[in-house]
């Protein structure tokens, strides 16, 4: 999984969307055989457990119950989610992290986040087992392997929060070999990807530091919709959001096997063991259900969190300070406690 390559939204060619957003026209023609509204949702990478809630909503019929016939289209190399939204090729898209909606605003491309599946961005720093590194603060001054995209993304926060400096940067090419042969190495990773790969390949459990647990304020795994759909068909957006929330709650706290079967069918390279360990980590680290989501419901977002993220990034020059960051999201479709009753039902003894 190479979603780390997309951590900095600069790799998304949102400027192209400026030319074509006016082409969007809501498709209100139902599928004749089902009477359901057809919708296409494109993800940010190949099918995996981190997309499980969406697949569960398909497999368990939650989208159908909401009057929707949803097709999930896998992302991957060369798949530009904002551009697909812009030309109307898809109805909804997945945004990997908080940079994506803000970059869309910076490009004046007319789309926003309507839900954040993950309260915690699963970005991590990884070390070998060692006594001298027990926190992110301990890494100050040490060489760290990060991707080019990361330098203008969460590395900005590490500099601001922990005093990291650019002379610590070493290039990460998504090859584990340099890390495995150097016991002093530190590298970036994705919570459910590199740590498990290291365990399988090298036979040891690395130390994993989830940035979100050290204050990193970004959300992850957004649902993106263009403003035309939000304005013209808010009821469709709400139906998609609610069914997705239900899918995530069912996937994380119920039986995930219906979604897992679809995930492995879409992505033959995915295996049951990788999915299983990812689900455990999503739950153990509270990736989807923690913080505001515990009271407001899965998918929650708040103005305070968005402001904190934007303030750090704009102060460091990632964005102009006068960018209308409020335009990156809407709270109209979340924070209603939807799905909390299902979670209580599934987790009750």
Residues of each region from the PLM?
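Secondary-structure end/capping motifs
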Residues: 233-318
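Short helix-capping segments at alpha-helix termini
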Residues: 62-65, 162-164, 201-203, 269-270, ...
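Conserved C-terminal helix/tail region of periplasmic/extracytoplasmic solute-binding proteins
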Residues: 306-349
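Pocket-lining segment of extracytoplasmic ligand-binding domains
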Residues: 99, 131, 174-271
């Amino acid at each position: 999984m190479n979603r780390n390559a997309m951590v900095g939204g600069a790799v998304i060619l949102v400027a192209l969307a400026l030319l074509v957003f006016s082409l969007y026209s809501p498709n209100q023609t139902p599928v004749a055989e089902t009477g359901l509204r057809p919708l296409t949702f494109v993800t940010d990478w190949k099918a995996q457990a981190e997309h499980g809630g969406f697949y569960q909503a398909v497999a368990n019929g939650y989208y159908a119950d909401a009057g929707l016939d949803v097709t999930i289209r896998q992302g991957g190399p060369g798949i530009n989610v904002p551009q697909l939204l812009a030309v109307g090729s898809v109805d909804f898209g997945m945004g990997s992290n908080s940079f994506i909606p803000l970059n869309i605003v910076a490009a004046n491309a007319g789309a926003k986040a309507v839900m954040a599946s993950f309260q915690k961005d699963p970005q991590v720093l990884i070390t070998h087992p060692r006594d001298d590194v027990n926190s992110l603060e301990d890494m100050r001054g040490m060489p760290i392997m990060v991707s080019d995209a990361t330098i203008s993304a969460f590395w900005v926060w590490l500099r601001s929060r922990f005093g990291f400096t650019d002379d610590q940067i070493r290039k990460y090419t998504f090859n584990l070999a340099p890390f495995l042969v150097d016991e002093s190495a530190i590298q970036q990773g994705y919570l459910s990807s590199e740590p498990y790969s290291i365990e399988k390949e090298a036979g040891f459990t690395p130390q994993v530091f989830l940035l979100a647990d050290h204050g990193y304020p970004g959300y992850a795994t957004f649902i993106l919709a263009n403003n035309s759909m939000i304005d013209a068909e808010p009821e469709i957006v709400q139906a998609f959001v609610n069914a997705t929330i239900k899918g995530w709650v069912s996937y994380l706290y119920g039986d995930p096997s219906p979604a897992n079967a679809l995930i492995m069918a879409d992505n033959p390279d995915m295996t049951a063991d990788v999915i299983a360990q990812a689900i455990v980590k999503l739950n153990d680290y509270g990736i989807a259900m923690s913080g505001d989501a515990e009271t407001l419901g899965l998918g929650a977002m708040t103005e305070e969190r968005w402001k904190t993220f934007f303030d750090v990034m704009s102060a460091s020059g990632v964005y102009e300070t006068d960018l209308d960051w409020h335009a990156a999201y809407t709270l109209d479709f979340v924070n209603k406690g939807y799905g909390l009753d299902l979670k209580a039902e599934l987790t009750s003894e």
